[in-house]
Curated annotation (Swiss-Prot):
CDD domains according to UniProt: SDR_c
Any one GO molecular-function label of the UniProt entry: oxidoreductase activity
Activity-pH dependence: Optimum pH is 9. Remains active over a wide pH range from pH 7 to 10.
Family designation: Belongs to the short-chain dehydrogenases/reductases (SDR) family.
Top EC class, one word: oxidoreductase
Function: Involved in the degradation of D-xylose. Catalyzes the initial reaction in the xylose utilization pathway by oxydizing D-xylose into D-xylonolactone. Shows some activity with L-arabinose and D-lyxose, but D-xylose is clearly the best substrate. Has no activity with D-ribose, D-glucose, D-galactose or D-mannose.
EC number, UniProt record: 1.1.1.175
Protein name listed in UniProt: D-xylose 1-dehydrogenase
This protein's UniProt keywords: NAD, Oxidoreductase
Record-listed NAD(+) binding positions: 42, 68, 91, 156, 160, 189, 191
Swiss-Prot/TrEMBL catalytic activity: D-xylose + NAD(+) = D-xylono-1,5-lactone + NADH + H(+)
Amino acid sequence: MSSAIYPSLKGKRVVITGGGSGIGAGLTAGFARQGAEVIFLDIADEDSRALEAELAGSPIPPVYKRCDLMNLEAIKAVFAEIGDVDVLVNNAGNDDRHKLADVTGAYWDERINVNLRHMLFCTQAVAPGMKKRGGGAVINFGSISWHLGLEDLVLYETAKAGIEGMTRALARELGPDDIRVTCVVPGNVKTKRQEKWYTPEGEAQIVAAQCLKGRIVPENVAALVLFLASDDASLCTGHEYWIDAGWR
């Protein structure tokens, strides 16, 4: 698909968490096409190295850095190494299925840490540098799941609901420094991982539930994120922006 070019993104320093596969890979590729300097964080070495090689011909080739976002010291270390940035995309997460009866205290901590906690601490790490650079954009990833009340995802949905609240609070706190904080809420996005799950019948059910009949792919999500990161969205902050084809 073709996409808009945002001159304001050229040369911007962008960090994308979970940028090595799925929606994240689409984000990494999208910012690279804009001429941004992209650093993407992940723990999936094989996928991330493959993406790095695939995008090596970009105006500024993206750089992969391995970082376990569940480790707060690792977050501090990687951002100290990266330095100041203009854009942070908090994309990383994991929607492991579970039943209420199976949830333990340790599993609660793990799910909240992998889906919510790192977003706060990554934002904390970049905010001083963004202030010094005269502003910036933080884009968090929510989920349609808790708006729909999907089953077997209570901790994932709890974390994703929290992200929307955190977005609003951070937008208020960081706004005086011209740091914008927004939240993207994707619908059902067709990634390589999801292609392994869904039968043709399942695909048809997803499309039937949408107002629009197109299937959402990572490039569609990236198009929204690129806009929110650009100067064209200079007065967009504190709210959720949906890309769900009307599935709600």
